[in-house]
């Protein structure tokens, strides 16, 4: 690492995007609530602990943190809070089992070097300590949900909050009325939970269609994230889009890919904990990566001291990468440049066990090495904005276009979404019109509200992504069709004049899909 504290020109911003689909009440393992609880325990708990520690050091404007409304809903949901508490306790039990192994047991992993009795005992002792700390952290800080913790970090100026639309839809393919509603209500949801209405958003999948900047301006959004290629790779400054003042910021792929890319990055280092190798009796992950082409049955036991040394190496490397990039980009454009590294939050801890430790150290090391760290709002306030630009239709998916969400592999889901949205909007319009014809103020319609909830869950961008990537594709199709069925079932009863049946159906579906309690169909744009 360049140990010189001489300042370099420009500004560095770290952006994290926190998102999972609505998983509560929809399966447990291997995809479902287990996915939520693993991410919560491995990423969300340590991330907020890291940020709180840095805030206690009087460090400000450290990261720009995107929190989707659907994740916030789960982090505050009593059912989910109870579920993750049980998950953490079960983790501790599994760690205690590993710590007490005395002889080789019959399992698929029994002959792995990382799963010998000696290796498991040593690993289990450390894992017990980790689980105990996580349980204590949860019990003392999280029992009232994630929002109080997030609000404290926002109030302290440690993070800038990015919001987004309800349920994470792929906005370019969404009917304009529902797109406007989802964004406006998503920003309002953040205001209700966190007492902050975000000025910036992480657009789901960094997806953009020409003209969306006008919608953003109308909703009070001042800036949003796109992927680097959307700006033709020139991400050194934010760019106002079209004829608006809404600024698009692009991810610097050269810097971001240093940490994580489809084929390389720090988490694949031989010393780090291997994500894919399990002890098949306890479900714990006791191996290190060892080598990129080393099979699980040959991976060495995890060595935390070796991993810790690798973290320091990668902190130093990243600091040098950021310094050099700021210097070269500032020289190229003839003024101080802005460099943005952006990642999914779940990378840090869930996919990369050592990620939170790396994050804490790098956020201390960058300022010490003369790098100014700030948020996207800081970039706008301090003039890191260039000339207006016209953006192409784009995303951060494969090909940097829309194919992951609109290609032949998911054509049936695109058609399903279109039909369900049409059904929902038509049904809600008729229901509200009938109620409006009565005397007095328009009452809230909980049946129409639930139709909107199920519709928004149907059009979540996660389902076509999972199908296109063949990642739990059957589960993704099941979820899309389940919520489509719920929408059609309630709407069908309502359209047939069976109001009591529609109400019972809506109440039933709400027991599983009761997120966004403030959602109100009366606010749907005309």
From Swiss-Prot:
Function, as annotated: Catalyzes the formation of branch points in alpha-glucans by cleavage of an alpha-1,4 glycosidic bond and subsequent transfer of the cleaved-off oligosaccharide to a new alpha-1,6 position. Is probably involved in the biosynthesis of 6-O-methylglucosyl lipopolysaccharides (MGLP).
Lineage: Bacteria, Bacillati, Actinomycetota, Actinomycetes, Mycobacteriales
Gene Ontology BP term (one): alpha-glucan biosynthetic process
Domain of life: Bacteria
Gene3D superfamilies in alphabetical order: Families 57/38 glycoside transferase, middle domain (1.20.1430.10), Glycoside hydrolase 38, N terminal domain (3.20.110.10)
Catalysed conversion reaction: Transfers a segment of a (1->4)-alpha-D-glucan chain to a primary hydroxy group in a similar glucan chain
Gene Ontology annotations for the cellular component aspect, listed alphabetically: extracellular region; plasma membrane
Keywords: Carbohydrate metabolism, Glycosyltransferase, Transferase
Name of this chain's protein: Probable 1,4-alpha-glucan branching enzyme Rv3031
């Amino acid at each position: 690492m360049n140990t010189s504290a001489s300042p370099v020109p420009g500004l560095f911003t770290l952006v994290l995007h926190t998102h999972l689909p609505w998983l509560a009440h929809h399966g447990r393992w291997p995809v479902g609530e287990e996915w939520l609880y693993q991410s919560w325990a491995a990423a969300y708990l340590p991330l907020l602990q890291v940020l709180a520690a840095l805030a206690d050091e009087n460090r400000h404007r450290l990261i720009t943190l995107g929190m989707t409304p659907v994740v916030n809903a789960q982090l505050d949901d009593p059912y989910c809070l109870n579920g993750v508490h049980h998950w953490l306790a079960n983790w501790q039990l599994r760690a205690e089992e590993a710590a007490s192994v005395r002889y080789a047991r019959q399992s698929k992993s029994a002959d792995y070097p990382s799963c010998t009795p000696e290796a498991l005992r040593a690993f289990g002792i450390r894992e017990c300590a980790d689980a105990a700390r996580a349980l204590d952290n949860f019990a003392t800080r999280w029992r009232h949900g994630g929002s109080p913790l997030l609000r404290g970090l926002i109030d302290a100026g440690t993070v800038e909050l990015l919001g987004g639309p309800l349920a994470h839809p792929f906005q370019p393919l969404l009917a304009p009325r529902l797109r406007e509603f989802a964004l406006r209500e998503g920003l309002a949801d953040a205001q209700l939970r966190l007492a902050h209405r975000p000025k910036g958003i992480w657009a789901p999948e960094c997806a953009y269609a020409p003209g969306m900047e006008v919608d953003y301006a109308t909703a009070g959004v001042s800036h949003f994230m796109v992927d680097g290629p959307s700006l033709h790779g020139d991400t050194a400054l934010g760019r106002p889009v079209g004829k608006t003042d809404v600024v698009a910021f692009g991810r610097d792929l050269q810097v971001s890919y240093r940490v994580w890319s489809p084929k390389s990055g720090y988490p694949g280092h031989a010393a780090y904990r291997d994500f894919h190798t399990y002890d098949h009796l306890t479900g714990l992950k006791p191996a290190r990566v060892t080598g990129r082409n080393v099979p699980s049955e040959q991976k060495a036991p995890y060595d935390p001291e070796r991993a810790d040394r690798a973290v320091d190496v990668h902190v130093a490397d990243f600091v040098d990468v950021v310094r050099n990039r700021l210097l070269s980009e500032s020289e190229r454009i003839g003024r101080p440049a802005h460099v943005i590294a952006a990642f999914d939050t779940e990378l840090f801890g869930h996919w990369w066990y050592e990620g939170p430790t790396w994050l804490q150290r790098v956020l201390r090391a960058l300022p010490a090495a003369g790098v100014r760290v700030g948020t996207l709002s800081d970039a706008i306030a301090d003039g890191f904005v260039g000339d207006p630009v016209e953006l192409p239709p784009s995303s951060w998916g494969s090909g940097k276009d829309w194919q992951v969400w609109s290609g032949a592999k998911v054509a049936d889901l695109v058609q399903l979404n279109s039909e369900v949205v049409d059904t929902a909007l038509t049904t809600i319009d008729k229901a509200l019109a009938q109620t409006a014809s009565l005397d007095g103020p328009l009452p809230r319609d909980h049946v129409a509200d639930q139709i909107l909830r199920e519709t928004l869950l149907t059009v979540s961008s996660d389902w076509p992504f999972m199908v296109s990537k063949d990642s739990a594709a059957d589960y993704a199709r099941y979820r899309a069709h389940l919520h489509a069925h719920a929408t059609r079932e309630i709407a069908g009863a309502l359209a047939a004049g069976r109001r009591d049946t529609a109400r019972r159906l809506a109440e039933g579906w709400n027991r599983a899909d009761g997120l966004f309690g403030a959602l109100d169909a009366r606010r749907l744009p005309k």
